[in-house]
Design a protein with these regions (language model features):
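Alpha/propeptide regions of enzymes that mature by internal proteolysis
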Residues: 1-308
Length: 308
């Protein structure tokens, strides 16, 4: 489960309740559950002290889980998150290996809440530096339309301070590289604990491709798991056969590659799917301006980029 920093205990408690409600033998005939709950801090936009996540929210999240496309952007635990000073949240992506290498799939889900605007890179293009005027602000200080709609080529009003100057003052903007990111890594490749650790380490390369340098105090976690290696709840034999991929040749390198690419894309999807949000104390975090971003990508020679 993913949530914010001050709701970890509440979510974990609700996961235990949900499990006990659906398994009457748990805690009497068999052991209990150890919930896994990860968090990032959304205090800039959210009234985090209110601890608004409750038992019903957790039950609904578990009961509504299903296959198919995953909702992205400002949803679930990602509702109040900020990525590279744009609105962030939940992003997903996956890669499938060639059939000759097993046809395995690597899936990534990221809850993005990290990075500083000048760091953002998309396909090698310094998007963050080009769009640095789109700063998180307090609505009482700066008029929202000027934040959301102003383009680098838009003429400034007569006698008005440049937008970058007005938005870069400490009382108006977030100017530090702080935050966290949670990456969930799933694969149907049969992996040992060692291999899963190696895959998790490569997720950091995917974050780096978007511009992250893992700032001081940034809590970056990767939780990796492999789906085919399942054990029976109660063992009926002293041993059991277990397959796992070998750590040599093309397969392991293709898995590394898949992790890096999918992690990078998941971060970018969290940005492209999130929209401008007004949070507590009239704070505004702008969504990534997609049209301007696409124009910049084309300007830098990424001619294949187009709006759907």
């Amino acid at each position: 489960m993913l949530t914010n920093s001050l709701n970890v205990a509440r979510v974990a408690d609700a996961v235990i309740d949900w499990s006990l409600d659906r398994n009457k033998a748990m805690g009497t005939e068999t052991w209990g559950i150890s919930p896994v709950v990860a968090e990032t801090n959304d205090m800039y936009l959210n009234d985090i002290r209110g601890r608004h996540v409750n038992r019903e929210h957790v039950f609904l999240a578990i009961d509504s889980a299903k296959g198919g496309p995953v909702e992205e952007g400002a949803v679930g635990g990602g509702t109040g998150m900020i990525c590279y000073d744009f609105k962030g949240g939940i992003g997903t992506a996956s890669r499938k290996l060639p059939d000759k290498l097993g046809g395995y799939t690597v899936g990534i889900l990221a809850q993005t809440n990290f990075g500083w605007r000048p760091q953002l890179v998309i396909d090698g293009v310094p998007i963050g530096r080009e769009l640095e005027q789109y700063k998180p602000v307090r609505r009482k200080t700066v008029n929202p339309p000027s934040v959301i709609a102003t383009h680098p080529s838009t003429p400034q009003q007569k006698n008005a301070a440049p937008l970058r100057t007005r938005l870069a003052t400490p009382q108006n903007s977030r100017v530090t590289d702080s935050g966290s990111v949670i990456v969930g890594l799933a694969t149907d490749a049969p992996c040992s604990t060692r291999i899963l650790t190696r895959l998790a380490q490569r997720a950091q390369n995917g974050l780096a491709r978007t511009g992250s340098h893992t700032g001081n105090t940034s809590g970056d976690f990767v939780i990796s798991f492999s789906t085919p290696r399942r054990k029976k709840h109660f063992a009926d034999a002293l041993t059991y056969p277990a397959e796992q991929i070998i750590e040599q040749g093309d397969l392991i390198n293709y898995l590394f590659w898949a992790v890096v690419e999918a992690t990078e894309e998941a971060v970018l999807n969290s940005l492209f799917k999130a929209e401008t949000m007004i949070g507590r104390d009239d704070r505004i975090v702008p969504g990534l301006p997609i049209e301007e971003t696409v124009a910049l990508m084309n300007q830098y020679g990424r001619k294949q980029v187009h709006l759907p």
